């Protein structure tokens, strides 16, 4: 049966791929409520985020999505329609407000009966919920596995292959429901990388898929997730992206150099850039990271190639990403606890000593290295061949 499901999904893939590319030609950029607000998020917070995206210059930099994560749901009405809770008195009005700013709005659910925060999920109401999202004017859906894992285990105890088949089918079901609405809605799969999702995510309509467990605002969490993306570059491209989770930049528990590493690595990975901080309370330092035009251009490069690891020696890693104009983005990462010098491996990258170099975080430095890379830090370069 699993083989039959995959065969049918692959037959439909050309159509799905075309629709996916239109929605997500480059990785999504925007904001998500979870990392800062968690289940406390309100209508007021979302409106404030939309205002801040415009006022701060983030909209002009490409941050378009304003995404509500978990905890917006109330119960269902007598007809089975999902109803927002009291924190969100009028979801259509909220969507209209976000759209009036020239932005897009996203929402969250689960294929299970409950979300991770124990709010109402979409289980057995997929078509109904998709229609409601479209009626409200939603442009993005994050679909989080959560309690559907219990459904899988109960239906097929000890049979992991069957459980994964059910997971694929659950995501495919919502994808078809979204397509049936006629509204272009970005479909974000959140299932923590299970069953090598990068191999099957496109066939169930995913525009992006989480490759690991949730990120936390710590260097250990961020770096373990980010550097674990090595080897996944061939699975990403226009319309379908590996997602190492949302940004923690500006949430305050990492150092400046660590946030530079975070932003640099996510850009090389062509990852979705979804800010997760309180946008109404951003420091100048946080803005300088999130609004850096060069790092955003690396992430959003229209070639659509995810970067990958070039070398790893002890705590030192070098990653590169090809760009459409022939340039190469290169990150020199120091995962160690002391500042150390690092150099460009010119020959390994197909470069010469005459290659022109732009230092993204230190534009006044036009040298060819070596560079002193701080503890947990990065030197991010754009190199012209």
Please name every model-derived segment:
Residues 1-20:
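Bacterial Sec-dependent N-terminal signal peptides
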Residues 183-278:
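Glycan-recognition surfaces
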Residues 261-310:
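Catalytic cores of secreted or luminal carbohydrate-active enzymes
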Residues 20-47, 52:
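N-terminal module-boundary/linker segments of secreted carbohydrate-active enzymes
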